[in-house]
Each structure stands twice: as C-alpha cells, then as structure tokens.
Amino acid sequence: MEEVIVPEGKEQQEKYDGSSIQVLEGLEAVRKRPAMYIGDISLKGLHHLVYEVVDNSIDEALAGFCDEIAVHINEDNSITVQDNGRGIPVDMHPKEHKSALEVVMTVLHAGGKFNKDSYKVSGGLHGVGVSCVNALSTKMHVEVYRDGQIHSQDYEKGKPLAPVHVISEAEATGNWEQRKTGTFVQFWPDDTIFTETVYHWEILANRMRELAFLNAGIKIVLKDKRVVDAEGNCKRETFYSEKGLSEFVRYIDGTRTPLISEVIHLNTDKYGTPVEVAMIYNTDFNENVHSYVNNINTIEGGTHVAGFRAALTRVMKKYAEDSKMLEKAKLKDKDGNSTIDPNDFREGLTAVISVKVAEPQFEGQTKTKLGNSEVAGMVSSAVAEALQNYLEEHPDDAKKIVEKVILAAQARIAARNARQSVLRKSPLSGGGLPGKLADCVSKDAAECELFLVEGDSAGGTAKTGRDRVHQAILPLRGKILNVEKAMEHKVFESEEVRNIFTALGITFGTEEDPKALNLSKIRYHKVIIMADADVDGAHIATLIMTLFFRHMKEVIEQGHLYIACAPLYKCSKGNYSEYCWNDQQRFDFIQKYGAGDEKAIKTQRYKGLGEMSDEQLWETTMDPARRMLKQVTIENAAEADRIIAMLMGDDVAPRREFIEENATYANIDA
C-alpha cells in the first residue's frame, strides 16, 4: 500500500537522491499473477497502469515540485506520461549498486514515497508503482531530465536492455523544450497478459478530471493521438481546477437546483492531518457523499466519512434546536427531545471529502474503506468549525437547510411506513414472494439468477425457456418509477420496486446501522436486467439501474447486477442462420453470405423480447454458455452520480446538450 504525498518544503529537495530509494520487495510474481497487483487484467487493470504512472507525478506535485502533467494515448495505443517535477533520482543506489532510476523501474515497492524524508504521503491504491507497469508492458522507455542532463533507459517485460545512459535533447522522445527537469515514461501494455488493450478516452478523462479537482493548481493535459480532426489536431482536453473541491462539488451538482447560495468549503491541516471538504445542498432527495484518501476513491467510506457525518449532525441539530424551528414543526417528543434523525440532515446534500493520511489503513470488501480511527476526530473538528461559521454568517441559507431537514424528517416517517411493507412482505419474514415471480428450484444463492424482464409477454416466454433449476423470472409492468425524481416514501410505495426488493430477499437493518441495506440473505448472486434491444428497452434498463444506484448500490458494488444483451436481428441464408446484435454484424453477414445484396438475405428484426420463441430467447440471451452479459460496475462514483442526475433528473437543458453532443455515437431507432 502506498502512502500519500504532502508538501514537505523545498529544503527536502537535497534529500531526494539515490539514498531516498528504499527497496521493499522484488518483481518476480507480477507477470505470473498480475491481477493480485493491479486488480484485474481487463479494462480496469489496463487503465490502472496509467494511474500508477500518473500517481508518481501527482506525488511530485503534492510535494510542491510539479505543476503540469501530460498524458498521451499514442497512435499505437501506447501511453506517454510526462511531468515537470524533479525527475526520478539517477545516482548510484547505495545498496543495489545500480542507478536509482533502474531500481525504481525494476523493483516492486521501490521508491521515494517509502522514505518520509522524501514524501510525507503519496497516492495510489495498490501501491505497486511504475515497476509493476514495466513488468506488464512489452516494452517501456523512460527519460529523466535532472542536473542538466537527460538520462534514459529501455526495458522489455520489466528487464533493462542496457544501463542508464545520458542522451541529447535531439535523441530524446520526450518534449523537453519548455521543461528542463522531470520524468517521461512511455509504455506498451502486454497483449499476452491483458484481455483488452485499447484505451478508452472517457475512462482516462474522468480520472484526470477527478485528480485535477482533488489537487488544485495542477494542470493535466490529456491527448488522444488516435483521433485527429480535419485540421490535423488530435483530440485534447486540459484539466485544471483553481478552487479544488469547491469546483468539484459544483461539477457533480451541475444539473441539480442549488438550495443555498454558496459552497461550504474548508481546507485545513491544523487538526493533525490535511482535510479538505466541500459541500452544498440542493433541492433533490438523495445524499451524495464522495470521499477520498490520498486521491483514492474510498467507495465504502470509513472513519473520515463518519467524522464528517458526526459533525454535520451535531452542528445542524444544535442550530435547528436553538432556532426553535423543530418545535414549530412538532418534531419533538412529549419529553421535549428532538425526533430528528441524522439522515434527515443529509437529504439533498452533495459533498466531497478529501484527506491526506501518512499511513492509511484500508479495510472492507474492496479495501476502499478507511480504518484509521484518529482521522474521524480530525475531520469532525474541522467540519464542525467551518459549518458553525457558515451558518452564523449565512442565516438565510441556514434557515433553508433546516426547513429542508424538517421536510426530510416528515417524509422519513412516511417512508418508514412504506419501508415496513418491504419488511413485512419479505420472504424471510414469512410474507411470501411476489405473485409474478417464477422462482428457481435451487436455494444456493451463489448459483441462482434473477431476470428482471420487461413486460408480461417476454416474462412468459422467459419462464418457459429458462433453466428452472437456477433461473428465476420477475416480469416488470412497463416503465418502473423514476426514483431520481421521487421522495423515498414514494419509492417504497411503488409495487414494482417493492417486488424487486422482496424477490431479492433484501431487507433493512444491520448490526452497525438499523437503516442500512442488508444483503446477508440475498437470494440471487446474479441479478440480470433483460429488456428489449431498442430505445424503450434501454430507457427501462436505465430506470432499473437508477433504482439500484440510488437505493441498492451495494448490489452493484458487490458485483451482482448485470444487463442481458438481446440480439436485434436474425439473418438467414438458406438453412444457415446467425443472430446479430448490431447493424455492423448484420452488414458483415450480408457481405459474407449475400455478396452484399441485402435482398439475398432473410432478415428478422426483433422489436421486442416477446417476438422471440422461448427457444430463441434461451439460446441468445439466457443460456450461460452462449449469452452475452454486461456487468454493471461503478468505475467513478462521482461521475456516475453526475450523469444519472443529468439524464434522469428534472433539468431538461443539460440533458438536451448531452444528447446533442453524443447523438453521433448513439444507436437511435428511427
């Protein structure tokens, strides 16, 4: 696990040399078990390679020695990362007896971040560093501009081809015209290791944008040299944030209607660790808190989130009680005690929490939950002070927040009654399963699947075509409720929503939190959304995904949610047939079997799942051996939050703009 980088002061520059590099572990196992080091060997792991290299540059920036990072996707799908930091040390390592640059690039867990004289804290989740990237690349080229010279070395699959040597600017690959210090790294991912080797612009852009918000004042330039316009200019975007998290919250909340005039923003290290928090209230009903430790998105929260929530509840509750607004709203019991709930203070809240911790302890299912107990108090103290000051200085905003809290409390009481119906109808409490559910025979959740099927017609076909032992079917009547626009009690008043909860066996209440979602008795480990392959079907699938993202996010985070891919066409030539999932596959079939003549091919277009026979539905969409499933994951929670709010919320203008920008790439039924 890598630590985080926090400025130590310019006097530390003298200490950043070969003796700063400490060797903790060798590289041998990386190529044999790559998933252990980068998470997986598909799309996520592929992009993680870029993050590892960029993290080194971010570390330099946080230490105060770098303010610009360039990330390029090259024509050959290699990646280039260049910064204007101090440059990796190149002098002789005292123990390894080779250049410190070679040690950093070829030994796992070797780097300045393990020496507190060089960096106080540093980024990166897995903490494997550039040596792991080197090991998983067919080749890598590195250049370091330091002490007036450019030092270079090349590698193949992690092994150096020659010692570190000095080259001229004319021989260099990096752009050193404006920079006279820094590090340049270019690597080619190994296609014998990764199942996917094509980099996605949006994935990298989202992470670079996130890093720019989290580290104010750093300019990150992303270029895609694979995409060139008519003037010969490649695709390019610059990410820079002057105000950091304050702008991040505005970006996330872009399509929501703000409740208060300003972002509440604090940035301090006076309580023992650097804490930055930005928060704002909107008129929506959801809580959206995004937390980071050393630039790592802690999707499971942790002690920093607990400290934030404790301070928010304590300060807001005191203000609400002192203002006598709770009494007027009759939110006090017979003894005069407040019946307000901590959750009431978080409805309509969007916040980003970022802390820098020297030695973070991560725990939880995905190792993205902060466990350092001391951080809770530090964050709580910092947030309490800033929030108290804001409420005193902005009484009009304070009143609006308390009024919203009161509405949230009143809605919560209504929602509690609606939620109780979910508990009462849970199969675990003896209330029985939904009448429309065709359950499977097996009771082993790990091997059971639940298909959420659009419409009774397709539901009937799926019931007869399924594997009855392992596959259950729950037909849904038309478009389910858009939960993005609904208050919580309305969500649980919806019969379709209640049926999904009940069928899954999901209840509320854990040992830690009586209101938390409880997945301990989930009845299926695969929940598969099966909708028509047209625009209406995509809309229904999006509504269902929104329900899970807002009210059952743990189902997604634990890897249970999938989307079935139904074919659009069945193309036949004589007795030979193929299913086609898109127009390109249909075109290829026509070219191959009809010599390009569309009339020579019999094409059946499926406007809906109900048009297929049970046998066709089984062999194309439900058979585990032949079907295609897309797993729903949350790669970037803040960006997912923003996109869902934009697409499913009330504000039309941003949604129209998004559609216009992406219409070229859309598959539109017309």
What are these regions (language model features)?
Residues 37-41, 112-123:
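Glycine-rich ATP-lid/hinge loop adjacent to the conserved G-boxes
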Residues 1-20, 27, 49-51, 59-61, ...:
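GHKL-family ATPase ATP-binding module
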Residues 32-51:
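Conserved short strand/loop->alpha-helix "switch" segment adjacent to the catalytic nucleotide/phosphoryl-transfer site
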Residues 87-92, 96:
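A short glycine-centered beta->alpha linker in the GHKL/HATPase_c
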Residues 410, 414-429, 444-449, 460, ...:
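C-terminal interaction appendages of subunits in large macromolecular complexes
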Residues 94, 363-375, 579-585, 589-590:
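Helical (often loop-to-helix) elements that flank the catalytic cores of nucleotide-handling enzymes
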Residues 29-32, 36, 59, 63, ...:
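Conserved helix-loop functional segments at active or binding sites
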